UniProtKB/Swiss-Prot annotation:
Subcellular location: Secreted
Keyword Secreted found: yes
Protein name: Jingzhaotoxin F7-10.36
One cellular-component annotation, GO: extracellular region
Cysteines joined through disulfide linkages: 2-17, 9-22, 16-29
Length: 34
């Protein structure tokens, strides 16, 4: 299952639900605006 915002993530954007990206700086999923 994908991770929602503020869940910790370690790898790529694939971890985060659609529309979110893994912020390597902060270490969690964040909303991404294209």
């Amino acid at each position: 299952s994908c991770k929602v915002p503020f869940n910790e993530c370690k790898y790529g954007a694939d971890e985060c639900c659609k529309g979110y990206v893994c912020s390597k700086r902060d270490g969690w999923c964040k909303y991404h605006i294209n």
